[in-house]
Regions:
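Long, highly charged low-complexity segments
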Residues: 1-72, 86-101
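Active-site-proximal helix-loop-helix substrate-binding element of RNase H-like nuclease domains
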Residues: 23-31, 67-193
Length: 193
């Protein structure tokens, strides 16, 4: 380079620059835990009034035939979400209240690895209808050579680093299933510090 020329700044940054991801502690959000029928019916009404919503199933594992549904999570707007714990005692009531929402063809449903969620819900007696968007498939179509897991997509698309699943359930010999995770830590409301 001559004295007047300087190399262009790299858009990728330095090899040693770590991206500053947003986290659950830096992004204002409201997470609701649905613990009674009134709150569940209010959530169902809100989902029914929307043109689309995001959802996820929480299960005791990845075996559609052997594991069970232990929770459902939903989002309609950014930075607000609901978690509905499902234990054997309330599962029938939860599913009967949410079935019309899942089976409403007018409402689009969005998720990550939706095929698994659809199979879990079908095994629980719900036939999800309407337009489906699977963020994992969409990302695969856009970038087939990359990883497509939810944590990776959150980092590259949203500049957000989710709470690692290991922080909730542990790993190895001490790993627990999602039905044994205390609900409050997963739905803690926060404002950034």
């Amino acid at each position: 380079f001559s004295a007047q020329e300087t190399p262009a700044a790299s858009a990728e940054g330095s090899l040693f620059d770590a991206p500053a991801y947003q986290t659950i502690d830096t992004v204002p959000h409201v997470y609701h835990t649905v613990t009674d029928e009134k709150a569940l019916r209010e959530l169902a009404g809100r989902l029914e009034a929307s043109s689309e919503f995001c959802f996820d199933t929480e299960t005791t594992g990845f075996d559609v035939f052997g594991d069970r549904l232990v929770g459902l999570s939903f989002a309609v707007e950014p930075f607000e979400a609901w978690y509905v714990p499902c234990d054997p005692a309330n599962l029938g009531q939860v599913l009967s209240i949410l079935r019309p929402v899942f089976e409403n063809e007018r409402i689009a449903k969005i998720g990550q690895n939706v095929k698994f969620d659809l199979m879990m819900l079908r095994s629980a007696g719900i036939d999800v209808r309407g337009t489906l968007y699977d963020t994992m498939i969409v990302h695969y179509l856009l970038d087939p050579e990359s990883r497509h897991g939810m944590d990776h997509l959150a980092r590259i698309c949203l500049n957000y680093s989710p709470v690692p699943i290991e922080e909730l359930i542990g790993k190895g010999a001490r790993q627990i299933t999602m039905d044994r995770v205390p609900v409050a830590p997963g739905t803690r409301p926060r404002t950034p510090t």
